[in-house]
Amino acid sequence: FRSRCFEQIARLVKKIWQERLGGNKMIGIGSDHGGYALKQAVIKHLEEKGYAVKDYGCYSEESCDYPVYAKAVANAVKDGEVKQGILICGTGIGISITANKIKGIRAALCSDTFSAHATREHNDANILAMGARVVGEGLALDIVDTFLETEFSNDERHIRRINMIED
C-alpha cells in the first residue's frame, strides 16, 4: 500500500511539474527486439532534450511480439497518459499497422524528415513509427526531432480529412 501511495504521489508531482513547464512533454516509446537498440538511443536523445519518456518495452533484444508494445503505446496516447508515441521495430510496418487498429490513433511510418514533418502538419499524427533496419541512428534522431517539433497546421482541409478518417 505504502509503495503504491508513493508511486501515485510521484506521478502527480511529475504531472504538475510538466504542466508548469508548459504542458505534457511525456513521450511514450516502445519497440520489439528488432528496434530495441535504436529505442535506447532515442530515449537518451529525448531525455537530453528535456522530454520525459515512458518506456513501454521491450527491455532486451530477446525475441518478442511487436503487437504487445504497439498496443501499449497506442493505448497510452489514446488515454492521454502520454502526449505522443514513438514505435520502432525492424521495418516499422507491423508496429504501425497494429497501432492504427486503436481508435483515435494516427500512427505514421516515416523514413525521412519530409514525411515526419508532413504527417504532423497535415495528418496530426500522434505516433511516429520507424524501422530500425531501414533508418540509421542519425537519421532516426532527425526524424524524431522533426516529428516532435512540428505542429499541426489546423487548416480546415486537414481537419476535414482527419474527421473523415475518424468517422
PLM region descriptions:
Residues 52-63:
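A short beta-strand-loop structural module common to alpha/beta enzyme folds
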Residues 27-42:
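N-terminal beta1-alpha1 ligand-phosphate binding loop
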Residues 30, 87-92, 110-111, 129-131:
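Short beta-strand segments
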Residues 34, 113-167:
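C-terminal binding/interaction regions
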Residues 69-108:
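Helix-adjacent hinge/juxtasegments
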Residues 41-51:
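A short, Lys/Arg-enriched amphipathic alpha-helix followed by its capping loop at the start of a domain
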